[in-house]
Amino acid sequence: MMEELSVQSALSCFSQIEFSTCLFDASRNRVIPLAVYQPHKVNSKTKVIIFSHGYDGNKNNKSNQTYAYLTRFLSQKGFYVISIQHELADDPLLAMEGNFMETRMPNWERGVANILFTIQEFKKLKPQLNWNDFILIGHSNGGDMTMLFATRYPQLINKAISMDHRRMIMPRTRNPRLYTLRGCDYDADSGVLPTEK
């Protein structure tokens, strides 16, 4: 019996709570589906991450759970992770031609509005979290949204991390701290990444 209790205690140290929920932004008449990964212990030191998925052609209403391997890992490390479902089935498809800084901007702006609304609502729902060290992470098109958010609302975030975003120019700024993880299969568009100059 004692052995069983110690195994349960050990497992509970690494456990987390996962759930799906939705927010409703009345000003845009928009539902924002979320996947939330909450660490076992939540307190004033618990940092918050909002994760933005890559584009999937509006085919998957659970794109915000596609990266669960990463969001779970971050939650196990003590972060409170909120993964936003950016594209809904009836949203316009992402532009695949033209000047992407223009043709994709409506999609990115919708993503920025989703992120901003989620921050505002969760600050009310979870005021005990550490919102001073807030982090944004995004992959591909979600990375473009992350960089646009960092450009428009730098005062709200501490760090912005993109994984293989290709289109949105990274702001040239000290704050927030910006990071990009790059694969070797696709290059970013000219001017997107900072140079040494």
Language model: regions and residue ranges:
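N-terminal cap/lid segment of alpha/beta-hydrolase-fold proteins
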Residues: 2-44
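Serine-hydrolase catalytic machinery in alpha/beta-hydrolase-like enzymes
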Residues: 30-129
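Flexible, glycine-rich phosphate/dinucleotide-binding loops
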Residues: 43, 58, 90, 143, ...
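Structural recognition of the beta-strand scaffold that forms the well-ordered cores
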Residues: 48-51, 80-84, 135-137, 159-163, ...
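Glycine-rich His-Gly loop
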Residues: 51-57, 140, 183-185
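Short, solvent-exposed loop/turn and secondary-structure capping segments
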Residues: 60-63, 93-95, 148-149, 172-173, ...
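Primarily recognizes the serine-hydrolase "nucleophile elbow" in alpha/beta-hydrolase
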Residues: 117-174
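The feature captures the conserved acid-bearing segment of alpha/beta-hydrolase catalytic domains
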Residues: 158-197
